[in-house]
A protein has these predicted regions:
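Bacterial N-terminal signal peptides that target proteins for export
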Residues: 1-9
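Alpha-helical segments in soluble extracytoplasmic regions
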Residues: 30-114, 121-161
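Bacterial signal peptide processing site
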Residues: 23-25
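C-terminal motif of bacterial Sec signal peptides marking the signal peptidase cleavage site
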Residues: 18-21
């Protein structure tokens, strides 16, 4: 009987190890897409909160930060578009890509407004910041619906320190 228990324990150990190995390595195209995009989003989130953060306010000097934010997000979007079809959840993925596109457009618009700033444009900039904040907030839930984790962490994308 003890030998049987030992064999059962070994077999169970192998089964558990095999199952754990399968769950940690992405197998489906959707899981590969999620892992690759989340890796990129992790870098984007660090950069948006680090060297590309707005700080106390937004000014003409931040145009280069906005350009870099746009470039990072476009690269993410292109990376995801080049990945194989996820097999399931395509509608949720398309919704997320659309929301990322809206946010990219908003950032690019803000960059142009900063570069062409004239006295009295403060209200225009404030309105665009509001549009961008709403767009950033829309990206997170759409990412979550598809299954992304890091790409859903958009809380500080439009954060201004107070």
């Amino acid at each position: 009987m003890p030998k049987v228990m030992s064999v059962v324990a070994v077999v169970l150990g192998l089964v558990v190890s095999a199952v754990a190995g399968c769950s940690s390595s992405p197998g489906s195209p959707k899981q590969q897409l999620i892992q690759n995009a989340d890796d990129t989003c992790r870098t984007i989130n660090k950069r948006f909160a680090g060297d590309l953060a707005y700080g106390q306010g937004l000014g003409a000097g931040d145009a280069s930060k906005l350009r870099e934010r746009v470039n990072l997000l476009k690269a993410l979007r292109d990376q995801v578009r080049k990945m194989p079809n996820p097999g399931e959840g395509q509608a949720q993925l398309d919704s997320w890509l659309d929301k990322v596109g809206v946010y990219i457009t908003g950032l690019d618009d803000l960059r142009g407004q900063l570069q062409n700033y004239r006295l009295g444009m403060d209200l225009v900039l404030a309105l665009q910041m509001g549009v961008n904040e709403d767009a950033a907030k829309a990206v997170g839930p759409a990412a979550k619906r598809f299954g992304f984790e890091e790409c859903a962490k958009t809380q500080k994308w439009e954060y201004l320190a107070s």
